[in-house]
Amino acid sequence: MKLYRLGNWFFRLGIPLLPMVCDALIRILHNSAVYSQTKIGKNTVFGYGGISVVIHKNAVIGKNCVIGPNVTIGGKSKSTRVPTIGSGTYLGSGSKILGDILIGQNCVVGANAVVLNDVPDNSVVVGIPAKIIRSNINPKDFY
């Protein structure tokens, strides 16, 4: 996360080469693709150092999120739009969030779930494709 923050800072300053160096180091050290252009909110953390996480460079992730290992946040073919993840959301290990969708605030995405549709605030989704199994949750009950 520190390398991402450093690369994002260089990116926001308009320094062209240093964000790419940070991106390359993230790939080498963590086997992940987390780009400096990606907007990731404060206090968001990666479980197990973000091993094998792939996040599209145009994705937006809110504050206070937890992203498990092997998570993919990206587009779908023939679409240039990518997911937006609300604040306080937990993305379980191996989950895939794909396409022009919005994951609401304080949601829980189960391990290995494939999310292809919007998820309302305070919901739990699981499965392939992901389905809502609980609504109006208190996220502190889940992590």
What are these regions (language model features)?
Residues 19-49:
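Long amphipathic N-terminal alpha/beta scaffold segment
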Residues 36, 41-42, 47-48, 56-57, ...:
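Left-handed beta-helix
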Residues 76-77, 134:
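Active-site-proximal flexible loops/turns
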Residues 1-31, 130-131, 137-143:
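Terminal amphipathic alpha-helical/low-complexity segments used for targeting or macromolecular assembly
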